[in-house]
C-alpha cells in the first residue's frame, strides 16, 4: 500500500507479524534509522477493518510522519483536511476528523469490540482534537489512524484520525 497526503506522505506502507519489525527497517529489510511506515499487525491488509492504524517515525526533517504534529493547528488542518490512501486493490479518501496527543498505551491502539467502546474512542478523539473538523461520524464509518511519536511527555504520541471512504 502507499499513502499520499497533500504530497506529504507519499510513501509505501509495510506490515509485519508484529509492530517492531519496520521501526528501523526499510521494506526490503535493510536497517534504516527512519524505518518504514507500517500498518498495525492486527489489521487486515486490505483496510477492511473498522479501525486501521498506520505508524511512522516523527522525523525532524519532516519525512515519514514528521509533519503530522502540524495538525495541532486549525489553519493547517483547514488547508490539509483530506488524505488519500492508495492500495493495489482499492483507493481511499480520508476525511480527517481529529488530531491529538495521547499516551502510547491509549485506548486508540486497542481494537474496539463493542459499539460502546467505539463510541468511547470517537468521543475521546473528538473531545481531545486540536482542530475542529465539524464532520459527523457514524458507527459504520471505517477509521484510519496515523500515529507518530510526540514529545510533550514520556511515551506521548500524536494521532491523526479520519474516515476512510472507498473511491474509484
How would you name each of these model-derived features?
Residues 1-5, 9:
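Single conserved hydrophobic/aromatic residue that forms the stacking wall/gate
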Residues 14-168:
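Extracytoplasmic/periplasmic soluble domains downstream of a signal peptide or transmembrane helix
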Amino acid at each position: 500500500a502507499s499513502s499520499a497526503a497533500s504530497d506529504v506522505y507519499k510513501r509505501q506502507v509495510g506490515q509485519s507479524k508484529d509492530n517492531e519489525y519496520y521501526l528501523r527497517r526499510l521494506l526490503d529489510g535493510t536497517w534504516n534509522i527512519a524505518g518504514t511506515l507500517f500498518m498495525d499487525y492486527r489489521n487486515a491488509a486490505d483496510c477492511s477493518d473498522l479501525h486501521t492504524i498506520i505508524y511512522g517515525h516523527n522525523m525532524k526533517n519532516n519525512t515519514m510522519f514528521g509533519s503530522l504534529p502540524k495538525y495541532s493547528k486549525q489553519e493547517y488542518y483547514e488547508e490539509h483536511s483530506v488524505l488519500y490512501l492508495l492500495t493495489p486493490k482499492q483507493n481511499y479518501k480520508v476525511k480527517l476528523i481529529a488530531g491529538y496527543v495521547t499516551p502510547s498505551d491509549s485506548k486508540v491502539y486497542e481494537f474496539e469490540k463493542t459499539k460502546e467502546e467505539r463510541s468511547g474512542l470517537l468521543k475521546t478523539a473528538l473531545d481531545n482534537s486540536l482542530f475542529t473538523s465539524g464532520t459527523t461520524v457514524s458507527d459504520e464509518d471505517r477509521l484510519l489512524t496515523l500515529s507518530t511519536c510526540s514529545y510533550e511527555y514520556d511515551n506521548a504520541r500524536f494521532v491523526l484520525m479520519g474516515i476512510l471512504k472507498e473511491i474509484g
